[in-house]
């Protein structure tokens, strides 16, 4: 061994050559930058995986545990929890997609490694020496490719220079090498070669591992591929790609590729998509020559590589001019341009990081959108379910009372209906009775008499025939009395019940069954002869009389005439009034029974929903307070990583202003946008971090709109203020001034009314996206050079379903209900009303009622009591009425912005037209 602890990065290759400290420093910076950002990506991925594990654990029936029963969850192959799937419910779709997780895990696990391939081993060794700026490998003897037996070489960082043989990924071999025997500057050739006649298979397969105290090796390992005869390049690359991100270099020393070279490159391109850095190593003649090939000339090598698909006609321009373009293969034939390897590696590594950051942010954004949508669904469920239950109870009562009224008032009608039915059906009933075939009674064909028991059975069967036919006829006519109920409100009631029962056990829809029983009571009237009914007593008296007559006279012969006579006597003995009374009584009994059962079932359903809603509210709170903010912060970090990789950290210009939570700076150019405004925010605690992250997500999720300030991107500065804090830099569209400054300078009436229209349009757009701004005020309305307005600062902007009821905003623009914690998007209408007061006044002076308040608390108390800005003499009547409507204390009475907008247009048309024709009687021009 030689030079223990000595740094090699300061030495140079003896003789002239392209290698040197400048190139090494650039490569070190590039690979060091990659490792730094890869560490942030790895940390974000780790926290994302933990987030999804926590979601599964908190919303599964049982949490997964380690086999030993410890606290750590058991991880699957991609870092996911090997747990049971989430139960069906609101958050069951929240999970890390397996393919994305596997891809990202591979990205963060595979560190970069420079792989040196080449036309022959001499060229590969020469390129390695140039990269390290040290002649560590011999290059003069390895000139015969046929006799070359170079084994795979691996150069890594170490505090001491060491050379050893090791099986890849296994163990080091204890062998004495030539480099161990004496001091050396160049590794002895016999250590580099494979001794094929050796009986030790491990020694034949082993790599030569070299550790060196070198700046470049501290950032990236270097692997030199073995000679072609020992192992094909595609196999070497395949092994390396399993554990590393290969930065492939290909050393050339001839003016053209051989047939074997082309075949090798075709195989690499067939199986891998990595770009390749082709470099022509300098020969002695090239080094001595002061002239080289001009860049514009196309060399034979360039033509061959273009034919193979490695190069395109624009590859040089892309590499030279656009640092953000995707990595492409590159050919460098001028030895002094080896430092372009740093550009090539930068683009390769950056492409890798940007793709990973995009994939991770896509997962974050998708799941965050699901959270927000689920929050809306849960909020709606919490609001609508109690109303549905109350509606169901009310409508069922109406249905019950309507049917009961029918039963009470229809008795006389039913009596007439029964008489009419009997008269209509009499002949038909008599014929049916005469032709009736008795069951279980043998009637002699020769006219012989039968016994008393058979007579009783025949009479009973005739009676049942008459009653069943009558029952069917009466029921059919009674149906028409309740059909209108189905059309009026039963359909709505049934749909309401179905929606309530969806979340309950689908096998027990007893509430709907009882509702059907209530409605169908009329369909199932039974004119039967059960014991205890007046109809039963009446008909049994008639039967007794017949039986008594049969007892004292000769038993009758069962003939057609006898059957008609029995049927006639049964019909004549029926009392229509008693039947009607019996039917109505039966109807009421069934109705009462079903009504009571329905009420009991509804109470049971309500109790079930009460427990479910309690769990839903807990979950809704968890989504708003924990899950969504936590995921939003991860999303902010992944998106900021993507932005800083693509566009670098922005440069702060002069300070433009300060707000409650940050400072706004001028930023001349960033990401192709100029000029920009940069808002630096230093969140003081976790809550502000979460709020900022959610704000960023809402802003980035919004489609571009001409009435909203564009957000170009974000960067997290981990060294803000000299490293004392972490700041989020939000890069936005820069406008001319804010409305406060504009009113102070003076704006014409037409301009001010146009600004009001622009603000309404912007707020309407936010509301259409489900967002509430909550802080509409003069300083949050920015003006461009044409004095068109755009809304900015969505710091308090949230979807209604994500609002926790916190008191936010600027005191004089805050609606009274904000202090109760229960509010909706009408708070923006209130704030616009106050803003419109300033717009109509044409000045920035506070309303007198607010100016007299000594403190915020005093102001808030006055607003709660109904204090509003005063009417100024310059106000137009219609403008004043619009202001008053907007700041009404009752949120439900405030106009919708869709109504405000046309009113503003008509005001503008009227006042500005009047102003152009004659002096205005209302609003004065403040310019």
Swiss-Prot record:
What is the E.C. number?
2.7.12.1
Q: Does the keyword rRNA processing apply?
A: no
Q: Which GO terms describe its molecular function?
A: ATP binding; protein serine kinase activity; protein serine/threonine kinase activity; protein serine/threonine/tyrosine kinase activity; protein tyrosine kinase activity
The answer to whether the entry has keyword Secreted is no
| Residues annotated as catalytic | 775
Name all Protein kinase domain ranges: 650-904
Q: What is the lineage of its organism?
A: Eukaryota, Metazoa, Chordata, Craniata, Vertebrata
Q: Which UniProt keywords apply?
A: ATP-binding, Cell junction, Cell membrane, Coiled coil, Cytoplasm, Kinase, Membrane, Nucleotide-binding, Serine/threonine-protein kinase, Transferase, Tyrosine-protein kinase
Please give the GO cellular component terms listed in this UniProt entry.
anchoring junction; apical plasma membrane; basolateral plasma membrane; cytoplasm
Q: Name one GO biological process term.
A: positive regulation of fibroblast growth factor receptor signaling pathway
Q: Which residues bind ATP?
A: 656-664, 679
Looking up Pfam families in the UniProt record yields: Pkinase
What is the protein's name according to its record?
Dual serine/threonine and tyrosine protein kinase
Its annotated compartments are: Cytoplasm; Cell membrane; Apical cell membrane; Basolateral cell membrane
Annotated Polar residues bias: 1-12
Tissue distribution: Expressed in many regions of the adult brain.
Q: Where would one find coiled-coil regions in this protein? A: 393-429
The family assignment reads: Belongs to the protein kinase superfamily. Ser/Thr protein kinase family.
This enzyme catalyses:
L-seryl-[protein] + ATP = O-phospho-L-seryl-[protein] + ADP + H(+); L-threonyl-[protein] + ATP = O-phospho-L-threonyl-[protein] + ADP + H(+); L-tyrosyl-[protein] + ATP = O-phospho-L-tyrosyl-[protein] + ADP + H(+)
Q: What does this protein do?
A: Acts as a positive regulator of ERK phosphorylation downstream of fibroblast growth factor-receptor activation. Involved in the regulation of both caspase-dependent apoptosis and caspase-independent cell death. In the skin, it plays a predominant role in suppressing caspase-dependent apoptosis in response to UV stress in a range of dermal cell types.
Annotated region Disordered: the residues are 1-21
* InterPro entries linked: Dual_SerThr-Tyr_Kinase, Kinase-like_dom_sf, Prot_kinase_dom, Protein_kinase_ATP_BS, Ser/Thr_kinase_AS
């Amino acid at each position: 061994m030689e030079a223990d602890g000595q740094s090699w990065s300061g030495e140079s290759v003896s003789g002239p050559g392209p290698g040197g400290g400048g190139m090494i420093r650039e490569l070190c910076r590039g690979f060091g930058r990659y490792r730094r950002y890869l560490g942030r990506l790895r940390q974000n991925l780790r926290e994302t995986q933990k987030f999804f594990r926590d979601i599964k654990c908190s919303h599964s029936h049982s949490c997964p545990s380690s086999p030993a029963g410890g606290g750590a969850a058991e991880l699957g192959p991609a870092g996911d929890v090997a747990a049971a799937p989430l139960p069906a419910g609101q958050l069951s779709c929240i999970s890390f997609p397996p393919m994305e997780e596997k891809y990202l895990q591979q990205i963060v696990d595979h560190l970069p490694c420079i792989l040196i391939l080449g036309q022959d081993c001499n060229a590969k060794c020469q390129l390695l020496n140039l990269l390290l700026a040290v002649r560590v490998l011999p290059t003069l003897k390895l000139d015969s490719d046929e006799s070359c037996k170079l084994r795979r070489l691996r150069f890594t960082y170490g505090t001491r220079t060491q050379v050893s043989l090791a099986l890849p990924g296994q163990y080091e071999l204890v062998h004495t090498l030539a480099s161990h025997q004496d001091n050396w500057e160049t590794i002895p050739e016999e250590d580099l070669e494979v001794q094929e006649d050796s009986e030790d298979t491990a020694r034949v397969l082993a790599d030569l591992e070299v550790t060196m105290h070198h700046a470049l090796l501290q950032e990236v390992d270097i692997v030199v591929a073995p000679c072609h005869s020992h192992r094909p390049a595609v196999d070497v690359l395949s092994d390396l790609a399993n554990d590393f991100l290969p930065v492939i270099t290909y050393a050339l020393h001839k003016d053209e590729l051989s047939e074997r070279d082309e075949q090798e490159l075709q195989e690499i391109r067939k199986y891998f998509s990595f770009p390749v850095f082709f470099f022509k190593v300098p020969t002695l003649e090239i080094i001595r020559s002061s002239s080289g090939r001009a860049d514009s000339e196309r060399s034979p090598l360039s033509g061959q590589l273009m034919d193979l698909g490695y190069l395109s006609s624009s590859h040089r321009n892309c590499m030279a001019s656009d640092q953000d373009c995707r990595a492409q293969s590159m050919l460098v034939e001028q030895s002094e341009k080896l430092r372009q390897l740093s550009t090539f590696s930068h683009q390769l590594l950056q492409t890798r990081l940007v793709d990973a950051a995009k994939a991770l942010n896509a997962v974050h954004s998708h799941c965050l959108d699901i959270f927000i949508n689920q929050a809306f669904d849960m909020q709606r469920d919490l609001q609508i379910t109690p109303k549905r239950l109350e509606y169901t109870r009310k409508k069922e009562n109406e249905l019950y009372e309507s049917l009961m009224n029918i039963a009470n008032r229809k008795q006389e009608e039913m009596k007439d209906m029964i008489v009419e039915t009997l008269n209509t059906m009499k002949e038909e009933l008599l014929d049916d009775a005469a032709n009736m075939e008795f069951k279980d009674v043998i009637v002699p064909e020769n006219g012989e008499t039968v016994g008393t028991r058979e007579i009783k059975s025949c009479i009973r069967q005739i009676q049942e025939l008459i009653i069943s036919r009558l029952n069917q006829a009466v029921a059919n006519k009674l149906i028409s009395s309740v059909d209108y109920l189905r059309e009026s409100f039963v359909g709505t009631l049934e749909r309401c019940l179905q929606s309530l029962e969806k979340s309950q056990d689908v096998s027990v829809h007893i509430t709907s069954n009882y509702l059907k029983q209530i409605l169908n009571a009329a369909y199932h009237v039974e004119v039967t002869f059960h014991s205890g009914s007046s109809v039963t007593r009446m008909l049994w008296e008639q039967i007794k009389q017949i039986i008594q007559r049969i007892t004292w006279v000769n038993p009758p012969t069962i003939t057609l005439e006898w059957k008609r006579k029995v049927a006639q006597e049964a019909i004549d003995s029926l009392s229509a009034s008693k039947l009607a009374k019996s039917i109505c009584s039966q109807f009421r009994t069934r109705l009462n029974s079903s009504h009571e059962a329905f009420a009991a079932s509804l109470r049971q359903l309500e109790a079930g929903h009460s427990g479910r809603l309690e769990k839903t509210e807990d979950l809704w709170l968890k989504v708003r307070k924990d899950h969504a903010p936590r995921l939003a912060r991860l999303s902010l970090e992944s998106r900021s990583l993507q932005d800083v990789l693509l566009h670098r950290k922005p440069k702060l210009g002069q300070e433009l202003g300060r707000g409650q939570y940050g400072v706004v700076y001028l930023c001349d150019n960033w990401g192709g946008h100029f000029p920009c405004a940069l808002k630096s925010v230093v969140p003081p605690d976790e809550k502000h971090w979460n709020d900022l992250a959610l704000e960023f997500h809402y802003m980035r999720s919004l489609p571009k709109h001409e009435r909203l300030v564009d957000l170009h991107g974000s960067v997290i500065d981990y060294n803000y203020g000299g490293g004392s804090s972490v700041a989020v830099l939000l890069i936005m569209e820069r406008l001319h001034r804010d409305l406060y400054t504009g009113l102070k300078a003076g704006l014409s009436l037409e301009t001010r009314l146009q600004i009001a229209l622009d603000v309404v349009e912007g707020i309407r757009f936010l509301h259409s996206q489900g967002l509430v701004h909550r802080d509409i005020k003069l300083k949050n309305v920015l003006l461009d050079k044409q004095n068109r307005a755009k809304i900015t600062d969505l710091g308090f902007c949230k979807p209604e379903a994500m609002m926790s009821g916190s008191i936010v905003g600027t005191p004089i623009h805050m609606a009274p209900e904000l202090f109760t914690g229960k509010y909706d998007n009408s708070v923006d209408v209130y704030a616009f009303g106050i803003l419109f007061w300033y717009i109509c006044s044409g000045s920035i002076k506070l309303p007198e009622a607010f100016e007299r308040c000594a403190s915020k608390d005093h102001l808030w108390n006055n607003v709660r009591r109904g204090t509003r800005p005063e009417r100024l003499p310059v106000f137009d009547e219609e403008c004043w009425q619009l202001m008053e409507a907007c700041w009404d204390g009752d949120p439900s009475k405030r106009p919708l912005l869709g109504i405000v907008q046309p009113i503003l247009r008509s005001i503008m048309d009227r006042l500005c037209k009047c102003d152009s024709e004659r002096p205005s009687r209302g609003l004065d021009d403040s310019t």
